[in-house]
Amino acid sequence: MTTENLVKAGLNEELAADIVRRRNEMDMKILELRDRASRDGYLDTERYARELNELREQDISLRDEIGDEYYDRYLFSSGQGNRVKVASVMMGSPAEMSGMKDGDLILNYDNRRMFNWNELQEATSRGERGEYVNVAVLRNGQMVNLWIPRGPLGIRLTSARVKP
């Protein structure tokens, strides 16, 4: 993460510099913990995992800090994928039965923006299995809303980089 990429995403330079500074401080704390745990012989222990989790709980995700719109722009300006693309739909899957197609870009799952396939996998595992949720996809430049039951979708995913 660089100040330059955050500024390209539309954040003012002072806020961008502050975010980068705080992220660097957190990264250093994690590196220091790892070094200390390695030197003191507790790197692969419950103690290390607990201390690492305590540190990470203090951290605020960049997405939460700057919001979806700026996060989308940040991903794009830093050369990262910012869309979840359906590489293929499995025959007989909930996705196929709901009308999902190869090449669809999944924008939202249950009214939450999706920027990478990990987020989508986590989202499909939340809530009550089988409950129908709205999945907004972009297909050939058109927004399409699909209703799909929670749980495995039956799709293969890739990422795409699309200008916000």
What would you call each of these model-derived segments?
Residues 75, 111-112, 125, 143:
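Terminal low-complexity interaction tails
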Residues 1-74:
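Interdomain regulatory linker/hinge segments that flank or connect interaction modules
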Residues 51-56, 84-85, 99, 109-110:
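Non-catalytic effector/regulatory segments
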Residues 95-118:
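Conserved PDZ fold ligand-binding element
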Residues 46-49, 59-62, 97, 101, ...:
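PDZ-domain C-terminal substructure recognizer with occasional recognition of PDZ-binding tails
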Residues 89-90, 109, 138:
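Active-site-proximal beta-strand/loop segments in catalytic clefts of secreted hydrolases
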Residues 63-88, 92, 96, 114:
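Coiled-coil termination/hinge junctions
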